[in-house]
Amino acid sequence: MSGYFVLKASGTQYMFNLHAGNHEIILTSERYTSKASAQDGIASVQKNAPDDARYQRLTAKDGSPYFSLTATNGQSIGRSEMYKTTQARDNGIASVKSNAPGAPTKDQTQA
């Protein structure tokens, strides 16, 4: 099973998650003020995910590794969860690279 995006609304804001084939969330977006902007964010993830240079490998204050996926303009378009090891973070990046391009979107904004 391949990955998929879930587009959600929360009040007047929109966001999306990228799920791996096992249904685990591997990337969470920023919040958007319009559905169209969130859909553009999904398209940007699909476009930028294969490019390793678009990933910032970061460490939280508590030492937990995580990553941020950035667009060509340098703006963050999604972040990972906090991982226990850098290897787990790198596996998360590999999962985004393989699951995001061409992933369908499940629109839950009408639910």
From Swiss-Prot:
- Domain of life the protein comes from: Bacteria
Source organism: Bordetella pertussis (strain Tohama I / ATCC BAA-589 / NCTC 13251)
A Pfam short name: DUF1508
Q: Where are the sequence repeats?
A: 9-57, 60-108
Provide this UniProt record's keywords sorted from A to Z: Repeat
Protein name, UniProt field: UPF0339 protein BP0521
**What sections of the sequence does the record tag as coiled-coil?**
none
Q: Which family does it belong to?
A: Belongs to the UPF0339 family. Duplicated subfamily.
Where are the stretches annotated Disordered? 86-111
Q: Which InterPro entries match?
A: DUF1508 (IPR010879), UPF0339_domain (IPR051141), YegP-like_sf (IPR036913)
